[in-house]
């Protein structure tokens, strides 16, 4: 008969073999939950893996039973993120993204001339849908531009709906007698409005003054307005200093104030000078005198170097200063060499 202690040991081992070992807490599976979740499980107990919201199961099995060995079977189940519909193309815009999987967010922007109609970003939801809905890039348009007072449109080509696209231009012109202040061209901006409008103002000019020793002609109207013109002239032996025609400017004054300048009488009877790049006889070219503003170059002798150089003289309102270095020779002094005939320095 075996000892009592041995009998008890054999009975315990038989109980363990029949009862089996407990299973530990299962290994974590990314993006999943286990029901029920405990520290240990008795042989025969079942657990169920399920993927968290936003994830779907791929491969493997979801339900496991704790075996007598106390070792869970290898779990090949994978929980993969849901994939939202492709959204990588936005007409007339740009999409910035890494992937289209849950829970990623993508952002949107539009090209120049278009605005975002909808949200600037969207998130891939648990259901595999974009939230909020994907936006579109709509063209920026401007309504017809307001027309300033005393102005009209000279260039304007709207769309069929009488609107204009971003970047479109409109050009204004002022009514007669009115001057424009500001840019005559406005542009449809990215904000859906037009750049600053110009202003048209009525402009009047005083009657132009008659210059001394001259005359002025202008329209025989009681009032002279913007863009009206006047012409000036001078009496004999006087020349006009300034433009012959002047215009009433947008600032209410004349574009210029010409005057009449006296011509110069020459005391020199005989000399060769340079006028407008050519050698001329002053007694022939300017026998009636030099007009205001005309300029000549006189020849002078350099005594030490025995060569010639030139100095300028200009008629200024009836006065001309002859260079001191110039020496006029009498026609009888035929033996003297004129400075104009000496080699240049």
Curated annotation (Swiss-Prot):
Keyword Signal appears in the UniProt entry: yes
Cellular compartment(s): Secreted
GO cellular component: extracellular region
Residue ranges of the TM segments: none
Tissue localization of expression: Expressed by the liver and secreted in plasma.
GO MF, any single term: heparin binding
Entry keyword set: Disulfide bond, Glycoprotein, Heparin-binding, Repeat, Secreted, Signal, Sushi
Domain Sushi: 21-81, 82-139, 140-202, 203-262
Source organism, top-level taxon: Eukaryota
Protein name: Beta-2-glycoprotein 1
Gene: APOH
């Amino acid at each position: 008969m075996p000892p009592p202690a041995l009998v008890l040991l054999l009975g315990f081992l038989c109980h363990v073999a029949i009862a089996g070992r407990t299973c530990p807490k299962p290994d974590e599976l990314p993006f999943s939950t286990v029901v029920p979740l405990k520290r240990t499980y008795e042989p025969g107990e079942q657990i169920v893996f399920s993927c968290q919201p936003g994830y779907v199961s791929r491969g493997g099995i979801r339900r496991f039973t704790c075996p007598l060995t106390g070792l869970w079977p290898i779990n090949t189940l994978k929980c993969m993120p849901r994939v939202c519909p492709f959204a990588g193309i936005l007409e007339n815009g740009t999409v910035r993204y890494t992937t289209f999987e849950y829970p990623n967010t993508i952002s949107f922007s539009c090209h120049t001339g278009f605005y975002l109609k909808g949200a600037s970003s969207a998130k891939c939801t648990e259901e595999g849908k974009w939230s909020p809905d994907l936006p579109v890039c709509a063209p920026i348009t401007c309504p017809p531009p307001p027309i300033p007072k005393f102005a009209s449109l000279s260039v304007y080509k709207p769309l069929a709906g009488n609107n204009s696209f971003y970047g479109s231009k409109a050009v204004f012109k002022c009514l007669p007698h009115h001057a424009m202040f500001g840019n005559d061209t406005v542009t449809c901006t990215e904000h859906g409005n037009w750049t600053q409008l110009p202003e048209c103002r009525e402009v009047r000019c005083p009657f132009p003054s008659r210059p001394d020793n001259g005359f002025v002609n202008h329209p025989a109207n009681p009032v002279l307005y913007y863009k009206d013109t006047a012409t000036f002239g001078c009496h004999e032996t006087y020349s006009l200093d300034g433009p012959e025609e002047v215009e009433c400017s947008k600032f209410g004054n004349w574009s210029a104030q010409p005057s009449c300048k006296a011509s110069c009488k020459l005391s020199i009877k005989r000399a060769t000078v340079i006028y407008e790049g050519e050698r001329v006889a002053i007694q022939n070219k300017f026998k009636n005198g030099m007009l205001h503003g005309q300029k000549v170059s006189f020849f002078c002798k350099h005594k030490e170097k025995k060569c010639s150089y030139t100095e300028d003289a200009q008629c200024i309102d009836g006065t001309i200063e002859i260079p001191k270095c110039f020496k006029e020779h009498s026609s009888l002094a035929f033996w003297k060499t004129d400075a104009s005939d000496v080699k240049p320095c």
